[in-house]
């Protein structure tokens, strides 16, 4: 009896020792961490970063010693990043396809569903609190202003249906992130529920085609997040 109990305790201890904690909403960070094989000094670019810890795809990497750029259109979110990750580059910007004044469909401070996309906003069950006019810029302009010399190992993009607008003004051939995770929203999908998604819907999307045409391979799909790896990183 005692021997059996001790074996059980040892099993529990080993299980706890090798337990991996995810900070992402859908465990995307565990997949990214696995892809990079525990790389300790990488560089990330997170557009639509929202919160520095909770439901965040880069916090696990940050804890491993990575650093990077976090961009969010909500100043209160960026204030949190400046507190939790003061050595990162934290930018309160609205990223889109051009420099312009656009409508922000605002639900509340720190809301994960604040969006520049009216169609996505109309699809949401929640009620828009306010429509604000904000100035947008592009990712290319932002990175050029930073005079970025770092190789982007990992890029995360989560901006509530506005992802393709960002890619329109982002030179993938120049910056060439090794790995990209991106939120996939198809408004033809019932209730935007991932259980109603399918592979055919993904490969027929403009998002998939754009990344595929820029030498990215689709390697994983978690809930509403798609993960792509650049051909050079694979080879």
For each feature predicted by the language model, list its residue ranges.
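Phosphate/nucleotide-binding beta-alpha loop and adjacent structural elements of enzyme active sites
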Residues: 1-235
